[in-house]
Amino acid sequence: MLDRAFEALNPDQGVIYLKQPTGEHHRAAERSVDGLAHEHLESATLLKKVAEEGLTAHVCGLDADPEWKSAESMLDQGVKSLIAVPLTDSQGPLGMIAMTSLSSRSPFGDRELEMLVSVASVASLRIRNLILTEEAVRRSLEVDQIDRELKLARKIQVGLLPSGVPEVEGFELHGCSAPCRHVSGDYYQIVPRRDGKELLVMVADVVGKGLGASLLTASLEALAAGPIEVGRSPVEICDRVGRRLHDRTTTGKFATMFIASLNGGEGKLTFANAGQSPGLLIGANGRAMRLKATGPPLGLFLNTDYSESSRRMALGDLLVVYTDGLTEAADSEDREYGLRRLTLVCKNHRDKPLKEVAQAVERDIGEFARGHPYEDDRTLVLVRRTH
């Protein structure tokens, strides 16, 4: 991982620190350009800001930045600019990856930061995978191999999903996901951006079910992390993820995705829908609008021009984003639940707390299916503008 990042970003020095069970950080890997006097990149200031506090560092002109005047070890080494990204997932911090330059002309721009965020996301997934694998080996030596793999995959996937919804001024939020097997091909994220002034909502559904689908879901999460972190728009995220997913997967592997950014001050909703079931925008007056696809599924074609659309969310309006596991839930006679019934339930409960809206949807699907087993994963994200 460090070598790949080093070759792509051309720094003078790079390092990966990993958090130990004791809470200390161990230098797991490092690299310097040929001919550079080898000095370990050690900075308590950098570790505190990035590895412990989870902040992304992008500094040009380190010696002139008062925020970094305490980073004496790096200043003594002649470091002029740096980018550093935390290694983390929903279960907590894992460490950090950092790149530095001795040149007064910084080689690190937004593109390089985005690349490092993507590398960190993939690295975090692999590190957590290794940690969970070690735990599984220690605790489950007598468990069947297939069962161990499924449980491990489930833990990884739960780690990808939000552990809770963030609190964002101006919005009420709720998200939930249920697999039809041990592991799921559904994925969602709710991410505050631009200092809490913007909210990004993403719901994705990869082709297939079970272990293979969950691994593809993990790849999708890693590919989307960088563009989301640096503030890309919904259509830009679709473009970038679609191309990279096509390059990294075999024929027939793809994902659908609904992604939207919401501005709390203006109430502006901007969305791109890559082959996903239409989202619903239900007004406070009960009128429902379908937010249909603006492009094909991600990874299906190499060159695809996605588009995005905008709507205004008035006070009390409800955004409903879901995967087709809800609308395609079937009863014993193979009749599907359908979008019309989902819309009706959401309209009838639109003034309720969002957790109660989600419970009403799940209850109504259960009454419709009457015990018939679910054939697909089910994910539902609800967003209401409150002020």
Residues covered by each model-derived region:
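Regulatory loop-to-helix N-cap segments in sensory/regulatory domains
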Residues: E39, L94-V119, K209, S307-S310, ...
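A short, aliphatic-rich beta-strand micro-motif
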Residues: K80-D89, G95
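Signal-transmission/dimerization alpha-helices at domain junctions
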Residues: E52-T56, S90-P93, E114-R139, A222-V230, ...
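Short loop/turn motifs at secondary-structure junctions and domain boundaries
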Residues: D65, S73-V79, P107, T251
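… and, occasionally, acidic/histidine-rich disordered N-termini of signaling adaptors
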Residues: D12, V137-V320, G371-H387
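Regulatory sensory and allosteric helical modules in signal-transduction proteins
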Residues: H26, G35-S70, L75
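Amphipathic coiled-coil signal-relay and dimerization helices
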Residues: Y17-L18, G23-R31, L269-N273, M289-A293
